[in-house]
Amino acid sequence: MGVPRTPSRTVLFERERTGLTYRVPSLLPVPPGPTLLAFVEQRLSPDDSHAHRLVLRRGTLAGGSVRWGALHVLGTAALAEHRSMNPCPVHDAGTGTVFLFFIAVLGHTPEAVQIATGRNAARLCCVASRDAGLSWGSARDLTEEAIGGAVQDWATFAVGPGHGVQLPSGRLLVPAYTYRVDRRECFGKICRTSPHSFAFYSDDHGRTWRCGGLVPNLRSGECQLAAVDGGQAGSFLYCNARSPLGSRVQALSTDEGTSFLPAERVASLPETAWGCQGSIVGFPAPAPNRPRDDSWSVGPGSPLQPPLLGPGVHEPPEEAAVDPRGGQVPGGPFSRLQPRGDGPRQPGPRPGVSGDVGSWTLALPMPFAAPPQSPTWLLYSHPVGRRARLHMGIRLSQSPLDPRSWTEPWVIYEGPSGYSDLASIGPAPEGGLVFACLYESGARTSYDEISFCTFSLREVLENVPASPKPPNLGDKPRGCCWPS
C-alpha cells in the first residue's frame, strides 16, 4: 500500500466573524438521485448553551460531484423559548417522508446543569418534509407520546446526533441517549445518574412513536444504529455508542431496537479524552465476501434469505414471539433469529424505558463465533487523536459482531476534527459503493467549519491498514458528564 490518499473536501458551513458557529453535522441521502440533506446547528458561539436553531443545505449529485444549494434556516424546527439541537433525520421509503428529529432545550440550560440537578429541560421534537427537504411542516412535541412518565426519571436526554435508519419491516429508528436518575436523596436532590443509549421507533410510518429499552449495563451516550447480517451468527440491530470508559461501546438488539442486550467495550475503537460522537453506516459486503450458511433460520423452518431492502433484516413473521413465562414480546425480524437444533441459550434482561421493567429479551446462542467476514460490513468515522479531537479517521469492520475486527484508521483530514456523519450515497463507477462524510474540521479548532467529502469502498480498502491492531487502553475511565 502506498501513501494514503486524502479525499478532497468542500467546506459547507464556516464560522463567521460575528461568532456565529456551525456544529453537530447530520447527513441524509434521499432517493432518487439521491438528494443530500446536510443539517447542522447554528450557534451564537461554539458553546452548547448558545445553540440557536437548525439550518440545512441541499445537495444534488451531478456528473460524479455534488452541487450544493444555499443555506436554509429551518424556521419551523423550533419551540418557543427553546433552543434547537442535535439534528437526527430518518427517511421513510414507504411514504417518501423525511422526519427531522431534534431536541428543544429550555433557554440556555446546559446539559451539565440538567445532569447535576436531575431536572430535565429537553423536549423531543420533529418536523417532516415530503419533498426531500424543500419545505417543512410545523414542529411536533413528542415528549409525552414517546416517553411519557419515564421522563421524570431522566436528568436529560437527546437524539443522535447523526442519522436514523429504517428496517425492511418498515420500522423507523432514531438513536438516542438519556442520563437516568439512579438515586435521589430524600429532599429531591440528585445523588447519581448514568448515561444509557436507546432508540425511539415507529411502526406506522411516523404517525406515532415509542421509546425502546435502554442499553442495560455499560455507560453509553451519543450513538448510531445499523442493521447487521452476521451470517452464521444471525441478524441484529447494532448500536455503537460514545462512552467515558476509554473506548467505544457496542450493543446488539434482537427485536429491532425494542430492547438491547448487555453492551461490551470495543477496545479497537479508542475514544478521545472525554469522548466524542462518532458515526457508523452499514452496507452489503462485496459479493465474493458474502458467506452463506443454511443451518440458520428466521423463524421456524425458514432458511436465512438474502436481504430484501437492506442488509441483515427480513420481513417479520406475523405471530408474536412468546415469553417462556407465558407472555408475549413484540415481533420483528430480529426477535426470532434462532439456530436450528437445541444449542445452549442464555437468557438476558430486556430493560424497559426506565431500565427496570420486568420484561425479557430472546437470548442469543452464547457464546457465538462471528465469521471472519459477514454479509454486512460497517464503516466508522471518529477523530483519531487520543488526547484531543484531531484527524478525522475512517475505520472498516468486515465482521461487526466481533469487537476486535476494526481496522486501524484511514485519516481523511489532518487537523482538528470533531463530530461527523456518514452516508452511503450510491454505486461507484468501478463497482462497489460511494460514501460521504460530513464532519467538523478546522485549522485551529474543530468548530471552525463543517466539511464534506466523498470516497469509494475501493478507496477505503486501499487506504485502511490491512489488519486490525487493538490499541492500548491504559486511560482510566472518565466521569459520566462529558463536554460535547
UniProtKB/Swiss-Prot annotation:
One of its GO terms (molecular function) is exo-alpha-sialidase activity. CDD domains: Sialidase_non-viral (cd15482). Residues 284-357 are annotated as: Disordered. Disulfide bonds: none annotated. It comes from the Eukaryota. Keywords: Carbohydrate metabolism, Cell membrane, Cell projection, Endoplasmic reticulum, Glycosidase, Hydrolase, Lipid degradation, Lipid metabolism, Lysosome, Membrane, Microsome, Mitochondrion, Mitochondrion inner membrane, Mitochondrion outer membrane, Repeat. It catalyses: Hydrolysis of alpha-(2->3)-, alpha-(2->6)-, alpha-(2->8)- glycosidic linkages of terminal sialic acid residues in oligosaccharides, glycoproteins, glycolipids, colominic acid and synthetic substrates; a ganglioside GM3 + H2O = a beta-D-galactosyl-(1->4)-beta-D-glucosyl-(1<->1)-ceramide + N-acetylneuraminate; a ganglioside GM3 (d18:1(4E)) + H2O = a beta-D-Gal-(1->4)-beta-D-Glc-(1<->1)-Cer(d18:1(4E)) + N-acetylneuraminate; a ganglioside GM2 + H2O = a ganglioside GA2 + N-acetylneuraminate. It holds the Pfam family BNR_2. BNR repeats lie at residues 127-138, 200-211, 251-262. It is an enzyme of class 3 (hydrolase). Residues 336-345 have a biased composition (Low complexity). A motif (FRIP motif) lies at residues 22-25. Substrate binds at residues 23, 43, 177, 179, 222, 242, 389. Coiled coil: none annotated. One of its GO terms (biological process) is negative regulation of neuron projection development. The active site is at 47 (proton acceptor), 48 (proton acceptor), 419 (nucleophile), 440. SUPFAM superfamilies: Sialidases. Induction: Down-regulated during monocyte to macrophage differentiation. Its EC number is 3.2.1.18. GO terms for cellular component: cytoplasm; endoplasmic reticulum membrane; lysosomal lumen; lysosome; membrane; mitochondrial inner membrane; mitochondrial outer membrane; neuron projection. InterPro entries: Sialidase, Sialidase_fam, Sialidase_sf. The keyword Mitochondrion applies. Belongs to the glycosyl hydrolase 33 family. This is Sialidase-4. It comes from Homo sapiens (Human). The lineage of its organism: Eukaryota, Metazoa, Chordata, Craniata, Vertebrata.
